[in-house]
Amino acid sequence: MSSSNDHVLVPMSQRNKNGLPGMSSRGARTLAEGDVLSFHHITYRVKVKSGFLVRKTAEKEILSDINGIMKPGLNAILGPTGGGKSSLLDVLAARKDPRGLSGDVLINGAPQPANFKCSSGYVVQDDVVMGTLTVRENLQFSAALRLPKAMKTHEKNERINTIIKELGLDKVADSKVGTQFTRGISGGERKRTSIGMELITDPSILFLDEPTTGLDSSTANAVLLLLKRMSKQGRTIIFSIHQPRYSIFKLFDSLTLLASGKLMFHGPAQKALEYFASAGYHCEPYNNPADFFLDVINGDSSAVMLNRGEQDHEANKTEEPSKREKPIIENLAEFYINSTIYGETKAELDQLPVAQKKKGSSAFREPVYVTSFCHQLRWIARRSFKNLLGNPQASVAQLIVTVILGLIIGALYFGLKNDPTGMQNRAGVFFFLTTNQCFTSVSAVELFVVEKKLFIHEYISGYYRVSSYFFGKLVSDLLPMRFLPSVIYTCILYFMLGLKRTVEAFFIMMFTLIMVAYTASSMALAIAAGQSVVSVATLLMTISFVFMMLFSGLLVNLRTIGPWLSWLQYFSIPRYGFTALQHNEFLGQEFCPGLNVTMNSTCVNSYTICTGNDYLINQGIDLSPWGLWRNHVALACMIIIFLTIAYLKLLFLKKYS
């Protein structure tokens, strides 16, 4: 759904002491009231492994002694690909792995507070909003988890409505954002929705990672105009950007140029051309300054070639060969350190209290939450249910397939008889049900993989705890997607097949299928948690279930397997379900009707099994009640183990880049 809203100039309203936009009685905040972010001697190194057989670890410097200050206004970080602009942005936002990081980031001269990641806003490059929800529902989710519970619902709704109006999202407020399967709002509206998610907490500092990526030039210009008006209300807006056009560049208040992790320029954006001219690089008429800066850094600009041509003869006479051969980046970095602009910045940074800078930052601690575990659990489960209903191709389709498959299997095995062929058919349908429950549970691998980026962003931003997210997703997935198919299978097949006609046996079969589905899904979660690619987790699951089928008890009699391999049967999920279903159905059944005891003994002696008990004994299944329930106990233990592994993998997942 496209909209002209991308190109509408939206006036930003004033803000009061409570930070509520559009409700001010005191007037707008001035620039002087905004937060000032300064960074001192920022150096960031990472360890890079190389080699195949012999792994060598080398240290790579991403940022090298970066100093600067970001004041209220538009602060742009510009540079070539791989220059370190996104790394610097993440460091300033306290979203970089603190290992390998040195230096200080201060807010108004003081270390970043422990809740800095929660109190500031961060808009990621790829908009991580729930596509199956509307714009308003996404904002409601952010408000419900990031605003204090003491704040009344009507106050939260008032803030949401104000932000929607501020961002020009009135016409699409109740439209779905859109997914890869369903069309939704436009790219510019999606970007503004992401910004609105962060404005819920009314942050004084807002970070954006390449906010114009994926947008056309007109929409990108509209987004930057919106950010410009927001900055005039006293916000410090810091963002990385790649090759902005001139209409966007002239909006910048401050410009930071990075290349190879070194600072090329940091100061007022409008002084950048004059600065480069003083370095000997003159921008051609009608050339975009942003493109010119990148061309100079990359050594591709005609200005660079012209400068070299004019000065080459003089340089050959006066400079040493080593200095003449220095890369442009090294020369520009050295020129900046000796420049007047750097001296002014350094003097301003030195005015900050030294004692405070040495305290260090606590911003890398765990997020500070303003809502309880139960409150977070309820909202996560609610959003997940809505997301499930918003993807009918995944939820409704699975239920329809379950009904159709159940009817087909019921027709194939319809009216099982109490004879030797009936025993074989019963074993066959039980084997199919347990293995089918396992393979259909492979879809659970998507539960954490698809939303990995969304989870990491929301967790770091202080939306919820890992435990709240984990159990909320379990409630929303295991109940409808694993419970209902098991109930449907049992209700359809039990009566079409003519299985044991007791209420107890009916519910035991249903419970067994549910336990198998839950165990297989838990295994899928344990394998997939922390993965980035669904196909890898799916492949591992499929291979695992194929091996489990071999030890389920139908394809080979488990008593005939050698002791060096027989222990693998205890790791087979289908085996426990298959054994429980057989015990539930065959115990006490007669399959040679009309035969007396003598003839029955003859049948047994000639290897014809006529009773369910004999069949169970032949399969090595204990006839006692414990022979049934120990399978469910084993499945329950496996569920606990797999879910614990999945939770720990989420808990210790690398959440910082």
Curated annotation (Swiss-Prot):
Q: Identify the domain of life.
A: Eukaryota
Sum up the protein's function in the record's words. Answer: Broad substrate specificity ATP-dependent transporter of the ATP-binding cassette (ABC) family that actively extrudes a wide variety of physiological compounds, dietary toxins and xenobiotics from cells. Involved in porphyrin homeostasis, mediating the export of protoporphyrin IX (PPIX) from both mitochondria to cytosol and cytosol to extracellular space, it also functions in the cellular export of heme. Also mediates the efflux of sphingosine-1-P from cells. Acts as a urate exporter functioning in both renal and extrarenal urate excretion.
Describe, from its UniProt entry, the tissues in which this protein is expressed: Highly expressed in brain capillary, kidney and small intestine. Lower expression in heart. Preferentially expressed (at protein level) on the luminal membrane of brain capillaries, in kidney and small intestine.
Task: Tell me which species this is from.
Answer: Rattus norvegicus (Rat)
Topological domain ranges for the Extracellular compartment = 417-428, 499-506, 557-632
All residue ranges annotated as the ABC transmembrane type-2 domain in the record: 389-653
Q: Which residue intervals are topologically Cytoplasmic?
A: 1-395, 450-477, 528-535, 654-657
What reaction is this protein's catalytic activity? ATP + H2O + xenobioticSide 1 = ADP + phosphate + xenobioticSide 2; urate(in) + ATP + H2O = urate(out) + ADP + phosphate + H(+); indoxyl sulfate(in) + ATP + H2O = indoxyl sulfate(out) + ADP + phosphate + H(+); sphing-4-enine 1-phosphate(in) + ATP + H2O = sphing-4-enine 1-phosphate(out) + ADP + phosphate + H(+)
Query: PROSITE patterns recorded for this chain?
Result: ABC_TRANSPORTER_2
Example GO molecular function:
urate transmembrane transporter activity
How is this protein named in the record? Broad substrate specificity ATP-binding cassette transporter ABCG2
Gene that this polypeptide is encoded by:
Abcg2
Q: Taking the first listed entry, what is the main subcellular location of this protein, grouped into a coarse class? A: membrane
